[in-house]
Amino acid sequence: MGLWDVDKIEYVGRAKGPKEDFAFHYYDADKVVAGKKMKDWLRFGVAWWHTFNQELVDPFGTGTAHRPYYKYTDPMDQALAKVDYAFELFQKLGVEYFCFHDRDIAPEGDTLRETNANLDKVVDKIEENMKSTGVKLLWNTSSLFTNPRFVSGAATSPFADIYAYAGGQLKKSLEIGKRLGAENYVFWGGREGYENLWNTEMKRETDHIAKFFHMCADYAKEIGFEAQFLIEPKPKEPTLHQYDFDAATAIEFLRNHDLTDVFKLNLEGNHANLAGHTYQHEIRVARESGFLGSLDANQGDKLIGWDMDEFPTDLYETVAVMWEVLQAGSIGPHGGLNFDAKPRRTSFYEEDLFRSHIAGMDAYAAGLLVADKMNQDGFIQNLQAERYSSYDSGIGKDIDEGNVTLADLEAYSLDKPQSELIAATKSDHLESVKATINNYIIDALAEVE
């Protein structure tokens, strides 16, 4: 059985019925969908922080999680033990990627030098396990938000010593990424923002973080670290207002600071909701702007206004996400679906780590199957083509091709009666569109054996 009292998770389809717990009903890793294996479309990753470090605390209570490595009370002993548990979990789930923050994998020392020594010991063991299992690092990142020194930010801190420390910490993190062959490197600015504008020099802070990003890019080039750099937008929490508010804001920041050749975006479902957007909206913005890099797979709760990091189970959302991915051709150049998600506080058994990942993996596999069926039928493409058909000829075509002026538009419209203008509009039949998507979900998944 191994370290975890769970067998390897296998694909069973729908044959054993909906109550089969420890099996995939829709995720068939080697099944070819739209010209690629399912595993190559989805490129699932496990998040070290939520999976192995999360004790399932909440603001009103202590942790409830049962984890086998809690028997190790020394922080370094536990950190090293987690590596063995982690790689067995990856293999039993059939997941080929993982992600971590530097401070997830090893305890901090009193100085950066001591902390780096701790990291080296754990990275040695991670590297050995990567070589023996073939599991790869989707991305790594640096925790520049948990320690109290980052109370007012890291690369936007008003305290130069903290900025300098952040740079030193980031240097080591990039070296680890290079050593472990990370395909991406993520920057999430949890403390990069402000609590109050009265005491904040916003331009100075954003200029500082832009300089920081340029230094990181320069050092990555110096050491030959070729990972795709990614910014992960989030509007707030823990900071009142974060500078990487959403996809559009982050893209504008990159354009303003000459960073568009270096960065793309890592987008998270629950972060999109906090910014007042759907996950599909954020992916669409990034995709159509050429900045789609990778995805963090989770969801929020419609009734709760903070970052819940639930495992994704909403099929309507996973269909929308995978439809966008199909249009893009991939989740970015080297991206994947990292489960930045944790079991609920009441799901505290060891086995719930497996149950929750199975739920998320099946939800996205189902989303891919439905999106592929919609794509094959051209349902969305035909819907959009019909809606914008007035731009295929006449004045519409001239507008699309940039061949008109305001004077031309005035001349075209001056004598058109209201009745003719109203007649030019058409109903969207939105309720039928949504019903048809529901039908695709039901029908496409019914075809799975």
Curated annotation (Swiss-Prot):
One annotated GO molecular function: xylose isomerase activity
Keyword Metal-binding among record annotations: yes
Note on cofactor: Binds 2 magnesium ions per subunit.
Active site (catalytic residues): 101, 104
Binding-site residues, Mg(2+) 2: 268, 271, 307, 309
Leading EC class: isomerase
GO cellular component labels: cytoplasm
Keyword tags: Carbohydrate metabolism, Cytoplasm, Isomerase, Magnesium, Metal-binding, Xylose metabolism
Cytoplasm as UniProt keyword: yes
Pfam families for the chain: AP_endonuc_2
Stored PROSITE patterns: XYLOSE_ISOMERASE
Co-factor requirement: Mg(2+)
InterPro entries per record: Xyl_isomerase-like_sf, Xyl_isomerase-like_TIM-brl, Xylose_isom_bac, Xylose_isomerase
GO biological process, one term: D-xylose metabolic process
Amino acids binding Mg(2+) 1: 232, 268, 296, 340
Subunit structure: Homotetramer.
Family per similarity comment: Belongs to the xylose isomerase family.
Protein name: Xylose isomerase
Organism of provenance: Bifidobacterium longum (strain NCC 2705)
